[in-house]
């Protein structure tokens, strides 16, 4: 495969939204990532895709501090509706700072800091994720052209820089509530996320 990731195994994964094929990938350092796929990608047509970074609090514990869980659910539903697509699930918790540091950052947010201020106060990067990992997964699956479910322009640019043709950006505005309103505004104001179209 690529030097970034190796494909390890695949299996059938029935979910609330339909059946996916789950592919497991591993980095040389042992970090694991998965991709959920539906359909065949051999025709070369653009593939509906979501690059989703792990969020234990939002994806599994249903936290209302973020929009991650609703975004993952909406992406899974969209891929099943399309009948063809991929969700790349990168194990980069807390924008790459890890779960314990995310809990520390959440504590500072509880004291009034926003998500960016909290990371910086802890001496951590604002965003330490590496979206190039997705390109390795696309390469393994033969995907060269995508329709990307995202509000994050950095994901688009990273894929383009890696030679992936992003033919369309599909906004993913779901999950806003009173608890995460400031967080979403900070993503727009300080991280450049496209939140208003």
UniProtKB/Swiss-Prot annotation:
EC number(s) given by UniProt: 3.5.4.25
Function: Catalyzes the conversion of GTP to 2,5-diamino-6-ribosylamino-4(3H)-pyrimidinone 5'-phosphate (DARP), formate and pyrophosphate.
Gene Ontology, cellular component aspect: cytosol
Coiled-coil parts of chain: none
Assigned keywords, A-Z: GTP-binding, Hydrolase, Metal-binding, Nucleotide-binding, Riboflavin biosynthesis, Zinc
Amino-acid positions noted as binding Zn(2+) in the UniProt annotation, renumbered to this chain: 55, 66, 68
Ranges annotated as spanning the membrane: none
GO MF term (any one): GTP cyclohydrolase II activity
Protein name: GTP cyclohydrolase-2
Protein family membership: Belongs to the GTP cyclohydrolase II family.
Top-rank taxon: Bacteria
The reaction(s) this protein catalyses: GTP + 4 H2O = 2,5-diamino-6-hydroxy-4-(5-phosphoribosylamino)-pyrimidine + formate + 2 phosphate + 3 H(+)
């Amino acid at each position: 495969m690529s030097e970034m990731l190796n494909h390890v195994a695949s299996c059938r994964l029935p979910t609330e939204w339909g059946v996916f094929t789950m592919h497991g990938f591993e980095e040389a350092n042992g970090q694991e990532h998965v991709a959920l796929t539906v359909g065949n990608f051999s025709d070369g047509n653009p593939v509906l895709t979501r690059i989703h970074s792990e969020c234990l609090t939002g994806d599994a514990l249903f936290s209302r501090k973020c929009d991650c869980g609703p975004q993952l659910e909406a992406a899974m539903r969209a891929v099943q509706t399309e009948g063809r697509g991929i969700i790349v699930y990168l194990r980069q918790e807390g924008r790459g700072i890890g779960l314990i540091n995310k809990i520390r950052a959440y504590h500072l947010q509880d004291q009034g800091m926003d998500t960016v201020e909290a990371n910086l106060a802890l001496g951590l990067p604002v965003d330490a994720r590496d979206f190039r990992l997705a390109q390795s997964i696309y390469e393994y699956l033969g995907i060269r052209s995508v329709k990307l479910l995202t509000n994050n322009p950095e994901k688009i640019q990273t894929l383009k820089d890696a030679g992936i043709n992003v033919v369309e950006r599909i906004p993913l505005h779901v999950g806003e509530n009173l608890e995460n309103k400031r967080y979403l505004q900070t993503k727009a104001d300080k991280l450049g996320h496209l939140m208003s179209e």
